[in-house]
């Protein structure tokens, strides 16, 4: 898959609207790029499985994982003045939410443009200006003037999803990508590009790609996919939060333009140290730039996959994303490309004996 096609794929998947529990549009965007790779199936949770056509069922199984959902919101109530109360789907910081364009899906599946809003400073007391912003003080304004208009003219009901209204862009000058949902649509794209790059090659493992739903609300999709696939080993792709603009220089472990990040630990998984060392050493040997990190917070689908059956060795190959879990992200294409390169090189070398050594 060449770079032009890869960027078109990333754009299509990034632009698709799909917060947790509402991944249908994302799955539909992924499917065309999975054609020809093998058997494509879905379950009732909207987890998408891509079983490599070269699989023979007699070799160890590698699960390639990424999650398809994005952080977003759900309409909780419609106020008498027509604005919408919302709850978070996934982890947001409240002060990052207001003053952005969003799309509200209505009962007919149409997307209604709106703005995330909070009380303007002109009408705030001094105490309100100094107080932390509470979620109950953030609304979505679609321009309705009453609850009745929001429901009847706009077709909005409670329980509908709300997503950032952002369109993917890429700069040839900087080789940077800007868009929404890079956590983890870059991971979904990495699965597809990895499988395309290995198409037709004889490997010593079977590969199943899984784009899992509902990661942002508790790795729920991966809990299912791991039970279905029953992997012997796994690679989790993630759009991981970059730290190069927000910590002391000596603490930077996830910078853009320095390669993918492999974490030793996060809040819900200690990475298999033997598998982790194998991946880091292989990257060094092949000259693939990588970063390794120790994380005290956050988690990935590895949290569910590594606890499957008798335990599964998992590494996380993360593409750094500045400002993850906001409306926008910035990522370097080279980091994405090197994440795919590392995954391909690992998969070319894995066999039953190597997997047992982990």
Question: What is the predicted function of each stretch?
Answer:
Residues 1-358:
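N-terminal hydrophobic/helix-forming segments and targeting peptides
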């Amino acid at each position: 898959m060449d770079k032009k096609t890869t960027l078109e794929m990333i754009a299509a998947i990034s632009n698709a609207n799909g917060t947790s529990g509402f991944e249908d549009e994302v799955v539909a965007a992924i499917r065309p790029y999975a054609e020809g790779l093998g058997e494509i199936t879905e379950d009732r949770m909207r987890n998408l499985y891509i079983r490599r056509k070269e699989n023979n069922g007699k070799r160890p199984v590698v699960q390639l994982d990424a999650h398809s959902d994005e952080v977003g919101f759900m309409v909780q109530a419609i106020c008498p003045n027509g604005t919408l109360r919302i709850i978070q789907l996934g982890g947001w910081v409240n002060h990052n939410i207001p003053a952005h364009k969003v799309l509200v899906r209505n009962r007919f599946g149409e997307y209604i443009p709106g703005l995330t809003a909070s009380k303007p400073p002109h009408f705030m007391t001094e105490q309100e200006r100094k107080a932390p912003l509470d979620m109950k003080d953030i609304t979505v304004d679609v321009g309705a003037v009453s609850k009745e208009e929001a429901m009847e003219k706009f077709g909005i009901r409670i329980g509908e999803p709300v997503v950032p209204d952002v369109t993917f862009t890429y700069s040839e000058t900087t080789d940077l990508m800007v868009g929404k949902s890079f956590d983890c649509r870059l991971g979904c794209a990495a699965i597809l590009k990895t499988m395309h790059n290995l198409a037709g090659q004889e490997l010593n493992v079977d590969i199943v790609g899984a784009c899992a739903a509902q990661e942002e609300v508790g790795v729920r999709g991966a809990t299912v996919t791991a039970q279905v696939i029953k992997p012997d080993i796994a690679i989790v792709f993630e759009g991981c939060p970059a730290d190069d603009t927000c910590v002391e220089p000596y603490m930077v472990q996830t910078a853009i333009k320095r390669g993918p990040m492999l974490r030793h630990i996060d809040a819900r998984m200690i990475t298999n140290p033997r598998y982790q060392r194998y991946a880091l050493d292989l990257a060094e040997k092949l000259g693939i730039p990588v970063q390794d990190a120790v994380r005290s917070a956050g988690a990935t689908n590895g949290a569910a996959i590594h606890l499957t059956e008798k335990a599964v060795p998992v590494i996380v190959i993360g593409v750094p994303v500045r400002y993850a879990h906001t409306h926008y992200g910035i990522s370097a294409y080279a980091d994405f490309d090197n994440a795919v390169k590392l995954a391909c090189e690992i998969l070319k070398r894995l066999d039953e004996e190597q997997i047992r050594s982990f």
